Amino acid sequence: MKAYSRSKLCNILFTRELARRLHGTGITANCLHPGFVATRFGDQSGGLISPLVWLAKFFAISPAKGAETIVYLASSPDVAETTGQYFYKSVPTMPSSRAQDDRSALLLWQRSAALAGMKE
């Protein structure tokens, strides 16, 4: 789970930096938490976590419900000029303090570009 959590943090940081770089272009970049969606994620976990994954699915939302914020961000005129934000249930929400660190966002961007063999 630690790797999964870090990947989600990186998604938020990368989006913040992308939004900063696109500022003034008319292109927006936002990220979101879809909620706990009933998917097959974790089905192959095995060990002690398998019963927890199975049990948790009773509290999950449908994929259609989980997609609502994605559709909202892609189509609503209410957020047409909103950028660099983190949304949950179609509402801008403050992510963790680590996810608001602009220096970390820049460093992640630079490291990603270097790993991809791209210039800044």
Model regions and ranges:
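Non-transmembrane alpha-helical segments in soluble domains
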Residues: 15-19, 71, 109, 113
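Short glycine/threonine-rich loop-to-helix capping motif typified by GTGT followed
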Residues: 43, 98-99
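A generic structural signal for secondary-structure junctions
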Residues: 46-47, 78, 117
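Catalytic loop of short-chain dehydrogenase/reductase
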Residues: 1-27, 33-56
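C-terminal helical subdomain
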Residues: 7, 31, 54-94, 100-106, ...
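Generic hydrophobic alpha-helical segments
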Residues: 18-21, 80, 91, 119
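Generic C-terminal helix-cap and adjacent flexible tail
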Residues: 114-120
